Amino acid sequence: MPEPREPTPSIAARARGLGSARRGTGAWRAERVTAVALVPLTLWLVASLVALGGADRAAFVAWLGRPLPALLVILLLLAAFRHTALGLQVVIEDYVHSAAKIPLLITTYLLCFAICVVGVLATLSVAFRR
């Protein structure tokens, strides 16, 4: 007669001692919101650039000088770099297990922020230059 097996511990029992899961829900939700926002914004940008296909610089500047395209490009930049920062944060937190984790996270956020600011300022510069 086989020996009785011990019951398999529940998921909650196996997760005890691994820390709180509350902190990650906001980042998880933000990553999903930015991903959903990026879909229509990216499709719009691709369609707009295809429509501008053979246009010269003056036509592009005139297009970006309109309020709606400028706003949508800025929203795309904000969503893209927030999404990038969140995704890289997850990768760093999951795979870097050394003292380099915190400096890497700070560097990642600073770079994403700086590149986003440069993109937004460049968009505004083109949009308001007439």
Segments from the language model and where they lie:
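Membrane-embedded alpha-helical bundles that constitute the cytochrome b-like, heme-associated redox core
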Residues: M1-R130
